């Protein structure tokens, strides 16, 4: 339940609230939407540092960069789809990939979790391309 609630709240707060506020704050400036996506994505990435604390610095940096890149993806999908439910569902899909890790006693993802994540990410990429093409 935690993974579901966190994903929904992050999207409501970062994309639904902050991204819109920042975009309006930049007003008619060129690239206002891009700036809003980038700022909220960096905040999203920084927010994920806490989940990586205690890991090697390379892992902390990788998770932060990965989360920032996902933030850009979620922000862009939100802008293109004009529907906050789309990034929420994408976010939940990614969060659910982490559930098998919760039941592992090692510091490594079980093979089934890696396969699940890989399949999910491929489907997310396909869906992202579909949304962009549909709206162009």
Model-based region annotation:
Residues 1, 13, 64-69, 93, ...:
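Membrane-embedded alpha-helical segments of multi-pass membrane proteins
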Residues 3-7, 41-48, 71:
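Alpha-helical transmembrane segments of multi-pass membrane proteins
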Residues 8-13, 17-18, 22, 46, ...:
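Active-site His/Glu-centered metal-binding helix of metallohydrolases
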Residues 12-39, 56, 76-83:
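Membrane-interface helix/loop boundary segments of multi-pass membrane proteins
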Residues 36-42, 86-98:
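Central hydrophobic cores of alpha-helical transmembrane segments
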Residues 45, 61-76:
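Hydrophobic alpha-helical segments embedded in the membrane of multi-pass proteins
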Residues 49-65:
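Interfacial helix-loop-helix junctions of multi-pass membrane proteins
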Residues 90-136:
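C-terminal membrane module of polytopic membrane proteins
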């Amino acid at each position: 339940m935690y993974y579901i609630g966190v994903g929904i709240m992050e999207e409501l707060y970062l994309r639904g609230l902050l991204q819109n506020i920042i975009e309006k704050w930049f007003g008619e400036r060129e690239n206002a939407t891009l700036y809003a996506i980038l700022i909220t994505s960096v905040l999203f990435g920084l927010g994920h540092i806490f989940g990586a604390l205690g890991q090697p610095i390379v892992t902390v940096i990788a998770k932060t960069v990965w989360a920032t890149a996902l933030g850009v993806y979620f922000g862009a999908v939100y802008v293109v789809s004009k529907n906050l439910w789309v990034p929420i569902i994408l976010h939940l899909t990614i969060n659910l990939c982490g559930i098998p890790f919760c039941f592992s006693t090692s510091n490594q993802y079980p093979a089934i979790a890696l396969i699940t994540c890989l399949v999910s990410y491929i489907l997310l990429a396909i869906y992202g391309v579909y949304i962009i093409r549909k709206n162009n």
